[in-house]
């Protein structure tokens, strides 16, 4: 079952309102205020939509308001049932410090079609479109995955570019990539934006190879599904996190999730820029109005577009 195309613009409006709210805190050195600035207007907009939405990927537990928390019901509670994966402000640090790649993001699918990932780490490899299905595997060596990718893309290994989150936990991956001659492009934060540099007509990277957030992995999968890209992820769970994962219906703690297991059906993805970034330009304050730019995808409609809108102050 596909999602009615009318919902795309409604969800775009929600991320636009979130981005405008967050933009008022750009460079103000206050991550928490910036996050709240996005959450409140986004929640208000989502609650206007005729749907019964449930947050399956959110920012925290119920007692951590003002977050959009896991299990929260959104919408008028009349209409289709949707799973919602949301990060009202991806890049709170980027916003507070006036750095690139902060945005407001949401992914929507029919109820039961999004993986409910706990807020834990997830190993991830992501690649773009037009490649053999299930090409790469987290249990392969880095060298084997890169060799397979180079062959599939008909490129020399030395011409491949890998995006890696700059963390000491990735030292072994970086060492292996460097030894075989892959160019490494580091990101300091911003797991979603980093992983999505593998898509587009002229992608900045050929592969994303990092351990980042589990919830972010599902949001990335939503966008990649619309593009025909691929991701494989595996949750990294300690004992407490295993208990939380069980409550979300996860039984196999070592399971490798491919894209079709993270996003099962139709999906909408919207990301509105707060600061300028790879996905969209940031909010522009034009004096009497705000100019906002959104990167929007709808899988069943094959929609891939960038939309610019204006809001009076």
Give the location of each predicted region.
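Generic structural "secondary-structure junction" signal
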Residues: 57-59, 69-71, 76, 110, ...
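Short capping/connector residues at structural and topological boundaries
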Residues: 73, 99, 127-132, 197, ...
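Short basic, glycine-rich beta-strand/loop surfaces that mediate nucleic-acid
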Residues: 74-75, 104-107, 204-208
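An extended, acidic
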Residues: 139-289, 293-298
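Gly/Ser/Thr-rich helix-start
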Residues: 59-61, 76, 92, 213-214, ...
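Conserved phosphate-binding loops in N-terminal lobes of ATP-dependent enzymes
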Residues: 1-33, 104-146
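N-terminal subdomain of lithium-sensitive/metallo-dependent phosphomonoesterases centered on the IMPase/IPPase/PAP
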Residues: 1-85, 147, 151, 178, ...
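DPxDG-like acidic metal-binding loop motif
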Residues: 79-90, 94-115
